[in-house]
Amino acid sequence: MLLQKIKVNDGGYIFLISSNVIKEPNPKLIISSAYRSAFSSVFKILSKEFAKKQISCINIAPGPINTDRTKELIDDVEAFAKTLPMKRLGKPQEIGDFVMSIVEHDIKYLSGAVINFDGANSNFVF
């Protein structure tokens, strides 16, 4: 309802920083997996509407990132990191840098995409 009342100018970006649980639900994060998947579906639909105004909607789905929340969920973060393909957690700054590079290079045609941002950790293809 709120989104229907927002006046949107032409051009720009809307980024959704979701989670890889939208593709690989996590039993420790049942509610998060459900609402993030649902919101990602809504975001995909909105991407088609906003495309008419040259607004790109890009969903970034991070995997293991070095945040306080990750530390709450994982008992031994250092041991867990060693199991990852890159042997480390992602950095929040890397997500910000990625978003900035999209904007700086005016990459618009990526609209509607979900970007897996997980250091090759996921097993899904799409």
Ranges and model annotations:
Residues 13-39, 43-52:
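Catalytic loop of short-chain dehydrogenase/reductase
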Residues 56-66, 103, 116-118:
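Conserved SDR Rossmann-fold cofactor-binding beta-strand/turn motif
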Residues 4, 48-49, 108:
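Alpha-helical segment proximal to the catalytic Tyr-Lys
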Residues 52, 59-84, 125-126:
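A glycine/serine/threonine-rich, flexible loop-to-helix segment
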Residues 7-8, 50-52, 65, 103:
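A short hydrophobic alpha-helix cap/turn motif
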Residues 84-95:
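A conserved structural motif in NAD(P)-dependent oxidoreductases
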Residues 51, 56, 110-112:
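Short, small/polar-rich loop/turn modules that mediate ligand/substrate recognition or access, typified
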Residues 100, 111-126:
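Short C-terminal tail/terminal secondary-structure segment
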